[in-house]
Structures are given as C-alpha cells and as structure tokens.
Amino acid sequence: MVAFTVDQIRSLMDKVTNVRNMSVIAHVDHGKSTLTDSLVQRAGIISAAKAGEARFTDTRKDEQERGITIKSTAISLFSEMSEEDVKDIKQKTEGNSFLINLIDSPGHVDFSSEVTAALRVTDGALVVVDTVEGVCVQTETVLRQALGERIKPVVVINKVDRALLELQVSKEDLYQSFSRTVESVNVIISTYADEVLGDVQVYPQKGTVAFGSGLHGWAFTIRQFANRYSKKFGVDREKMMERLWGDSYFNPKTKKWTNKDRDADGKPLERAFNMFVLDPIFRLFAAIMNFKKDEIPVLLEKLEIALKSDERDLEGKALLKVVMRKFLPAADALLEMIIMHLPSPVTAQNYRAEQLYEGPSDDPACIAIKNCDPKADLMLYVSKMVPTSDKGRFYAFGRVFSGTVKSGQKVRIQGPSFTVGKKEDLFIKAIQRAVLMMGRFVEPIDDCPAGNIVGLVGIDQFLLKTGTLTTFESAHNMKVMKFSVSPVVQVAVEVKNANDLPKLVEGLKRLSKSDPCVLTYMSESGEHIVAGTGELHLEICLQDLENDHAGIPLKISPPVVAYRETVEGESSQVALSKSPNKHNRIYLKAQPIDEEVSLAIEGGKINPRDDFKARARVMADEYGWDVTDARKIWCFGPDGNGPNLVVDQTKAVQYLNEIKDSVVSAFQWATKEGPIFGEQMRSVRINLLDVTLHADAIHRGAGQIMPTMRRATYAGFLLAEPKIQEPVFLVEIQCPEQAVGGIYSVLNRKRGQVVSEEQRPGTPLFTVKAYLPVNESFGFTGELRQATGGQAFPQMVFDHWATLGTDPLDPTTKAGEIVVEARKRHGLKENVPGWQEYYDKL
C-alpha cells in the first residue's frame, strides 16, 4: 500500500535542498482536500480508484460527515523528477528525489486560525481557486495571511470539469475566465506582497498556474503541453511556453505565429492556448459525453492513451475519468509545479528568518535559522497541538528551523510569554520521541534535521498551544502568530451533574490546547466561558468538549457576543483620584485613539516589544503622533499588547519611576474590565498629567497606587463620552440572480448593511458583500437558506469593531439595553455608576 518506506523519507530529510514544505489553502468548498488526495495517491497511500472521494486528510468523523476540513493535517510525500526537469529548477538541488511535506488546511472562515498555524511551518502555498466561483473573500484572507508570513504562492484553478459539463462554455470563454481569475489573484498578491519576496505574481506561461479537476483527478500546466509540442515541432520549450498563453495565434496555412487574431485575408485565427491546449480536452469531453463510439479510439491513439481491456467497456463520466487521468494525471502537474516553483527550506529561511525570530537578526540563533543549519543548536517552533489516539495526550506539531531534534534530547521549552534572562514560562525537559506525521497515522523516527516538519511526544504538558524549543541558552522566542480572526462569540458551559465538575475543568484545558483560537476562562460570577470565532467554530469546539475532552453531558447557555468599551471625546475635566491613605494623587485625562492606530496595534504593526525610538518614529511618520508622546508610551493594555495606551505627559515628578510598575498593572486591570459592563476597553488613550507622591517609599506601595490608578482611569473614561463597540462580520453571499431579493430582506431584518453587489462575468452568480453585526448573526445561515430556497451560501469573517452611536448610560437606547442585560448577567447593579463614584475632590 505505502509505496515508500520511512527510511527513504528519513534519508531525504538530510538533503534539505530537496525538501518542500507547503500548505494547501483556499476558500471553503473549492476542493482542497480532493486535490490533496490525488497527490497522496501518487505517494501511494490511497488506492487509485478511491482518489477524489477518500479525502484522506479529513481525519475526523465530523469532517467526513459535513464534507468540510476542520483541522489542518500533515502528510509527507515522496516524488521523483526526470533529469531534464531537474535542470530547470532555479535553486540548488541534489539528485532527483524530492520530499514534500504537505499540509491540508481548512477553508472555512471560522477556522482560519488553523490556517495560520499551518502557514507558519511551511514556505510555499498551493492556492486553490474554483473556476466557476473565482476568487472569494476567504481566498483573499488566506492569501493575505500567507504573503504576510512571506510564503510563496502557486495557483491551481480547480473544478474545470464543472465549466465544461455544467456551464458548457466555449473555448474562448474558458480562456477569458481563466485569465480573469489569474488576474484577480495577482491583484491580491501585488497588494500584500513583501518586497523581500521579489515578484511572486503567478503566470500561466511560466508554469506557476495549473488547471484541472480534483474530482476527476486530472490537471495540467502549460509547461507540460509545451513539452509535448516542443518535441513534436522541434521548437525550444521556453519559447513554446510563452506562446501557449496570452495573445498569440498560430496560422495553420502559413505555419507562422502571429499576435493578431486575424490572418492576411481577415479570417479569424484561433488563440494558441485554445488550439493546442483546450482543443484536445474539449474533443475528448465531447466524444465521450456524446457517446461517439467511433471517434474515441482515434482520439486516444493520437494522444497516446492506452486503455486496459476492462476499461474499454466503460462509457460516459466513468470513461471520462479514466481517460483524463491517463492523459493528464493531476499529481504529475501539481508535483512538478510544487517542486519547480516553491522554495526549499534553505532558500526560504534565508529571507524568512528575520520575520520568524524575535531577537536581533545578528545573534547566533537567527544566523542558524537563516542558514537552515542542521549542525547548529536546535531552534524548533511548535505551531499547534494534535490530539493522540489515547485521550488527553497531544503531539506537539512543529518545524525544525535549525539544528536536529532527537528522541530523548533535553531542550528549553519556551512558552509565548518567555523573555530572555527570566525564568517565567520556561521548562527544561527531555523530548520522549519524535514522530513523522502521516495524515491518519504516525511513524516513529530517531531524529529530524533542520527544515523538516515533525511531531514530538512528551512535551504537551509544558506548552499551552505554541512555543519555541531550543538548546541555545540565550535564544529569543520565535514570533507569536497573529490570528486574523478574534474570538467574539462566547457561551457559558455548566455540567448537568455536579460531580463532573473536575472533568469539565480538565476538558476545558485540553480544548484550549487543541485549538489555536479558542479561549476558555472563568468569569467573575464563576461561570466557565468558552469563546470562539463564529457559530460553526463554537459548535465544533463544544462538540469536541462534550465528546472527547471532558466526555460528560453539558448544559450550554445561548451564545453571547463580546463587546468593547471605548470613548469618543476627550475627558471634559481632569480626573483626579487619591490613594486610600490620602497621601498620593493621580491626575489624568482619557481620549480616543484613531482607528488606524488601534488596527496597527492589533495587527502587530505597532508592537509593544519593539524598540521605543523606532516605534515612535513610525507612529510620528505614519499616524501623525507627537514624537515626545510616542516615546513616552508606558504600556499597552490589556494583556500588555492591546489597543489601549498610557502616555506619560507629566513634568518633573519625583519618584515617578518607582510607581511605573503599579500604574502599568492597574491599567491592565482597568482595561480588561471597563466600568460600563466589565468588557475590555478598546482605543482608549490615558494621558498622565500629574502625580503627587508621598516622600516616604512605604506610603506609595502597589497597594496604594493600583486602586488609585484604576479609579482615575475609570473616572477619566466616563468623563470622555463613553460608547460601546460591537463586533461586525463581513458576509459574502453567493447566489443566483433570483435569490438576491431574499438576501436583502434577511439582511434588513438583521441590521445588515450591503457593501457591494456584483455579477461574476460569464456566470449567472451574484456576489453580495455586507456587514452584519455578530450579535445578529446567530441562525443567519438558516434564515438565509429559507428565504432563498437554499440557493445562497454565506461566508462570515470578523471584520471590524463598530461603535454604537447611542448613549450606553441611558437604558432606553439600543446600547443601553445591551448594557443593562449584560450587567444583569454579570450580577452587577443595573445602573452604570457615574464618574462621581471614581472621582475624588481635592
């Protein structure tokens, strides 16, 4: 069954130039797992007949039932190239066998955190786009994530069989549709690409775009056709590739190439791509689907396709599958494209190192990553945890960036909040053993050198979700992943039977380990809260919790949305607060932060860990901050990295530095639970104006300063026109024209705003984009299907926080209702306390 042995793979791991780490990314239902199948089958794991139906990488039962991928799965493939193909590879290679580590990731928006984890450990991405639907919202999101991680894309345009069989398009229409899709992918690439990568746009004539059908198991690149024809006509292959795309035409009478679409007599000429590439495919489809028994053998002979005796009796789609698979096997086209155009770890780590590593780019760890050096000390990034077959244990799944990881080796396990020189979040433990991930199976190996993807056993109890393993004494962490979605939907979970409580607590711990983007915590009123990125994500998480992680029946509250508290103006007067012993005073004002700056902080462009001078320069140049203010940012909050700031604007205050720590921790506390209804603050800037402190150190300890700073922050906040913000989804809905009306009526009921509506050229489909408050999104999918007779498919991504215009302190308004309800739920007094509660008179 398996066509290659673990030893073969292991020996290839040492030739890092011949390794490719790649992930398959796409919009939901564009056929990632199906395409992955044809690759896996080439490596000899699925039997050929099953490919296209097995979806080997969908390992979970719910994935197979729903027909979607939820968790990303890794698999290693082995491939050999012919000598002449190897010569065309633009980077260093040894020999002609290649090892491809492939990660199939989910396309559904709610799981984009899984995609981020997959992208971190790979260097190249195969972007799958549906011919009929084209580039969708999720294609763009994932592609943007990939380019942000400096990952090189190649594209495959999938489901071409749909265009031929369902839409019955003409050759020229198909060419136009292809070229539109390629163009829209390139627009996204040029918008988000990093200069370091150089030109990573995709070009069919260079072989970085493949066309095919995952379901039928066939695909081709222009390079393959150029190969066939260059032998036949005796032309140079490079020249042939240029001619098979774009505006080049072949005149069969004069046997000349031209770039005009008419010949000398004014008769139309056929485009070379249509004539040489699409024509044989169209003819095969026509002959087989119209059951023309006499034409088929002639065509097959011309195309040198030999059928076995039992295959000759097939007809219709079954025959089509067999023939197309022999004519243009998908695996050949895709593997060739992956090997030729995606970078090896040696090439990629050279330009990815600075972006992966938190420390300076000249320290030994970073240099070892740059050189992908298997003999240096170990640097390994764990991007996620994968549950093992025995309950409660996890494999740490990650990639070796430098050094070699061995079974039984002692390593430093550094969690995300580790800083160099401190002991916090650091364990020194031995790795029990290393394994090779193979979709549904694992194979033990002794060691694994730099540039490869590996699973580790025995360190799951020291890492929460991600972290760095190293043997350097002074290594910084690998950078933490930025998720493009945030957990905004939460539910409270209770046990039905009080004796099961310890199991629930244990289960919640396991759940937060197994999913990179789920949050679990205990609220003040003692409820256990689980937060996810959307309805589907939460549903899957809770199902996992009930069935696997905790294994007990649960009571689940209706879903609740996370809000944020913010301010719209500057404080109308200076907020003053005295310490409990009346010897210290803090004076401050609150004011809003521009949305741009908040987004830059949330997206990691402005980073609390950056050098303060460099950060001040960026904030002054790009966001128009005053340089002295930007240099005096004391901290970000909550959690040390949120979009709220404390700026020190005091003049000549004695002992100021001694209270800095207390002020910072009080600010973290205040921004985590705002005064309106205990939600996090967002986009609030606190300016410290003056501080009077007692001369005696004992009278200005943390116990005096922290409550004071918190009260002052609340007072300043409530004096500055407080507002609340709700999370908003961007919804993209695809549907036929007659269903558009139904969509509008549902969106209007749900406070939705339509942003754009456009028809995809060449198809009857409309794409409607709209903003929909997360609060209204529950059951939206169901209502939409009802209103449109099941013809509309929504995709929702968290897009932004929108400020509610009404006053949250007035219980008669929309915002006020939300506040009162939330305060009841949290068990607080119904009325929001006024600023007077937190303000002290002189």
UniProtKB/Swiss-Prot annotation:
GO terms for molecular function: GTP binding; GTPase activity; ribosome binding; translation elongation factor activity. Pfam families: EFG_C (PF00679), EFG_III (PF14492), EFG_IV (PF03764), GTP_EFTU (PF00009), GTP_EFTU_D2 (PF03144). Gene3D superfamilies: 3.30.230.10, 3.30.70.240, Elongation Factor G (Translational Gtpase), domain 3 (3.30.70.870), P-loop containing nucleotide triphosphate hydrolases (3.40.50.300), Translation factors (2.40.30.10). InterPro entries: EFG_II (IPR041095), EFG_III/V (IPR035647), EFG_V-like (IPR000640), EFTu-like_2 (IPR004161), G_TR_CS (IPR031157), P-loop_NTPase (IPR027417), Ribosomal_Su5_D2-typ_SF (IPR020568), Ribsml_uS5_D2-typ_fold_subgr (IPR014721). Residues 17-253 form the tr-type G domain. GO terms for biological process: translational elongation. It is an enzyme of class 3 (hydrolase). The modification Diphthamide is found at H699. Keywords: Cytoplasm, Elongation factor, GTP-binding, Hydrolase, Nucleotide-binding, Protein biosynthesis. The keyword GTP-binding applies. Its main location: cytoplasm. It is found in: Cytoplasm. It catalyses: GTP + H2O = GDP + phosphate + H(+). Disulfide bonds: none annotated. GO terms for cellular component: cytosol; ribonucleoprotein complex. Its EC number is 3.6.5.-. GTP binds at residues 26-33, 158-161, 213-215. Catalyzes the GTP-dependent ribosomal translocation step during translation elongation. During this step, the ribosome changes from the pre-translocational (PRE) to the post-translocational (POST) state as the newly formed A-site-bound peptidyl-tRNA and P-site-bound deacylated tRNA move to the P and E sites, respectively. Catalyzes the coordinated movement of the two tRNA molecules, the mRNA and conformational changes in the ribosome. Belongs to the TRAFAC class translation factor GTPase superfamily. Classic translation factor GTPase family. EF-G/EF-2 subfamily. PANTHER family: EUKARYOTIC TRANSLATION ELONGATION FACTOR 2, TRANSLATION ELONGATION FACTOR-RELATED. This is Elongation factor 2.
